[in-house]
């Protein structure tokens, strides 16, 4: 009938190419899950007592901090920027929050978390102001503030160390708090917080106008500006949110380790970038998901904690592994992602075979 749409068989007959159901982002996430599964199988053969509840709990607790930082980094990278100061922000917020809690033992947990996130947000706003309104490349700005924030912490600490004995008991027990226990596997509160934060932000990116603006600015800043989008405010907000999430990660870092020195958070900037990029976030901006960043964080912490348990591999290879993962992820994004996106945006091919004419009969 003339008023009905062509069915699948008719579309194939007309030469229309059927589109796959999986978007490139979903395909990358499924590939990451496969790599994680293979990694677990390989290390289970190399390491005794590898598949244990205690190791699972250790990986997920460590992953929670990396995942929150990866989410922070992802939001900035989506706007075609990068924040290399997140490790220093973690160090500053962890130390200052610990210092405050040591002097004010009765501080409620919500207020302590808010203090850490507020400090991080202020530091992120400083980064964002210089990038968005000062027009200074983000890699230059955050390399500078990485050193500035760390130097301030060293000067402020004056060789003092925050110890677990000086902190409130609720904070020391926070990483061990369990939401659900399944045999020897504990779903701890710190992991739950990280997952809730990431899922909430992913929903905001996918369903709110703010999320569409973030992707638009990262995809083509000039076009977004011509369309009337407040590109400076969007960039500033991305850095502020990155700082606030880094502050949350600083609080989690403080609760996990208890003992905080001026070296707290060093190296986390590399881990956050690696988790985001390995998770499928394009380093060129405008593409990627927080779910992918979460899986990237899981893979990175799994590899790091697994490699430590293999005696033949030196622990100093950790950064080399992260660097290799970043290079492989970027190469894969350019090689595979480009072809997949071209496939999605290219017009369907028409069949070269001419359509058959219906037979006609003379009256």
Region spans (language model):
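Structural signal for alpha-helical transmembrane segments and their membrane-water exit/capping regions
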Residues: 35-51, 153-157, 201-209
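Cytosolic-side transmembrane-helix boundaries in multi-pass membrane proteins
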Residues: 1-41, 226-233, 303-363
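Helix-loop-helix "hairpin" substructures at the membrane interface of multi-pass membrane proteins
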Residues: 108-116, 122-127, 131, 182-261
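Single transmembrane alpha-helix segments in multi-pass membrane proteins
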Residues: 37-105, 129-136, 276-290, 324
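Hydrophobic alpha-helical segments embedded in the membrane of multi-pass proteins
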Residues: 63-73, 88, 92, 125, ...
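Short loop segments and helix-boundary regions at transmembrane helix junctions
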Residues: 21-24, 77-82, 103-104, 121-164, ...
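Transmembrane alpha-helical segments in multi-pass inner-membrane proteins
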Residues: 240, 246, 256-323
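Transmembrane helix-bundle core of multi-pass membrane transporters
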Residues: 138-207, 234, 257-265, 309-310, ...
């Amino acid at each position: 009938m003339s008023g009905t749409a062509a069915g699948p068989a008719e579309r194939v007959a007309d030469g229309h190419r059927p589109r796959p159901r999986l978007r490139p982002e979903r395909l990358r996430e499924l590939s990451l899950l496969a790599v994680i599964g293979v990694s677990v199988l390989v290390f289970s053969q190399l390491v005794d007592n590898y598949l244990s509840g205690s190791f699972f709990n250790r990986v997920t607790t460590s992953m929670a901090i990396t995942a929150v930082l990866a989410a922070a980094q992802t939001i900035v990278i989506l706007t075609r920027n990068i924040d290399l100061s997140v490790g220093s922000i973690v160090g500053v917020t962890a130390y200052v929050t610990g210092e405050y809690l040591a002097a004010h033992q009765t501080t409620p947990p919500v207020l302590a978390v808010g203090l850490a996130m507020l400090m991080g947000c202020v530091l992120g706003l400083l980064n964002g102001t210089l990038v968005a309104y000062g027009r200074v490349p983000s890699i230059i700005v955050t390399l500078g503030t990485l050193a500035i924030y760390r130097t301030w912490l060293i000067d402020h600490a004056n060789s003092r160390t925050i110890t677990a004995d000086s902190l409130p008991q609720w904070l020391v027990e926070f990483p061990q708090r369990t939401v659900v226990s399944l045999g020897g596997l504990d779903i701890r509160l710190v992991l739950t917080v990280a997952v809730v934060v990431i899922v909430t932000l992913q929903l905001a990116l996918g369903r709110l106008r703010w999320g569409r603006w973030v992707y638009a600015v990262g995809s083509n800043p000039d076009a977004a500006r011509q369309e009337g989008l407040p590109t400076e405010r969007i960039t500033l907000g991305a850095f502020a949110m990155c700082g606030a999430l880094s502050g949350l990660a600083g609080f989690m870092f403080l609760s996990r380790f208890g003992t905080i020195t001026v070296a707290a958070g060093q190296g986390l900037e590399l881990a956050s970038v690696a988790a985001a990029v390995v998770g499928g976030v394009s380093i060129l901006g405008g593409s990627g998901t927080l779910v992918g960043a979460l899986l990237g964080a899981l893979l990175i912490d799994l590899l790091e904690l697994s490699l430590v348990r293999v005696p033949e591999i030196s622990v100093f290879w950790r950064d080399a592994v992260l660097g290799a993962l970043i290079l492989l992820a970027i190469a894969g994004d350019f090689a595979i992602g480009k072809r997949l996106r071209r496939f999605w945006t290219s017009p369907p091919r028409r069949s070269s075979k001419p359509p058959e004419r219906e037979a006609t009969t003379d009256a």
